[in-house]
């Protein structure tokens, strides 16, 4: 699993797309375009606003859809925040925020096979993640984003810092990244990115993913 993480470049966070009812087709398209890791994150989504929070059984059902799609495309499937859901869904990856479960507690729940990542938002958090127990970390937001309302964006300076201190540990730039902004992110030193709307809001998710992946691979 660690070798797959090392080669991963494009990480997608998607909601359950309940208001559209097209999660399976969307996931297949995005993964066919080159997404390496696909994460279910429904918090703050249009579906949540319309239908309410995703209940555990429904979250597991959505996880099964993404897990099946990821397996078909030799990609990895991630769960956000919930170590119990990650274990039940046999997720490849669990992603934690700074205020979620401690990494050692989460790993005790998921078991050793599940990779664990963490969000970082300042230099101290980046430095801690670079030498800590997480398998990867995310750096940002690079720009303000509606998926994290009210959060100050540390910007590309934090990306530059991560590029200097991360060493061999995989890390991903995150927050407001799209095809237009990607060159700036690459110039700051990132070689892996997390995106949301750049693919979820695209008319052609496969094409959007393929364009991003092509630029990422060209920068290696």
Curated annotation (Swiss-Prot):
Substrates-to-products reaction catalysed: 2-[(2R,5Z)-2-carboxy-4-methylthiazol-5(2H)-ylidene]ethyl phosphate + 4-amino-2-methyl-5-(diphosphooxymethyl)pyrimidine + 2 H(+) = thiamine phosphate + CO2 + diphosphate; 2-(2-carboxy-4-methylthiazol-5-yl)ethyl phosphate + 4-amino-2-methyl-5-(diphosphooxymethyl)pyrimidine + 2 H(+) = thiamine phosphate + CO2 + diphosphate; 4-methyl-5-(2-phosphooxyethyl)-thiazole + 4-amino-2-methyl-5-(diphosphooxymethyl)pyrimidine + H(+) = thiamine phosphate + diphosphate
Sequence positions that bind Mg(2+): 81, 100
GO biological process: thiamine biosynthetic process; thiamine diphosphate biosynthetic process
Keywords, in A-Z order: Magnesium, Metal-binding, Thiamine biosynthesis, Transferase
GO molecular function, a single term: thiamine-phosphate diphosphorylase activity
Cofactor(s) annotated in UniProt: Mg(2+)
Keyword Protein biosynthesis belongs to the record: no
UniProt remark on cofactor binding: Binds 1 Mg(2+) ion per subunit.
A Pfam family reported for this protein in Swiss-Prot or TrEMBL: TMP-TENI
Chaperone in keyword set: no
Pathway(s) of this molecule: Cofactor biosynthesis; thiamine diphosphate biosynthesis; thiamine phosphate from 4-amino-2-methyl-5-diphosphomethylpyrimidine and 4-methyl-5-(2-phosphoethyl)-thiazole: step 1/1
EC number per UniProt: 2.5.1.3
InterPro entries membership: Aldolase_TIM, ThiamineP_synth_sf, ThiamineP_synth_TenI, TMP_synthase
A GO CC annotation given for this chain: cytoplasm
HAMAP family: TMP_synthase (MF_00097)
PANTHER family xrefs: THIAMINE-PHOSPHATE PYROPHOSPHORYLASE, THIAMINE-PHOSPHATE SYNTHASE
Identification of the protein by name: Thiamine-phosphate synthase
Protein's organism: Mycobacterium marinum (strain ATCC BAA-535 / M)
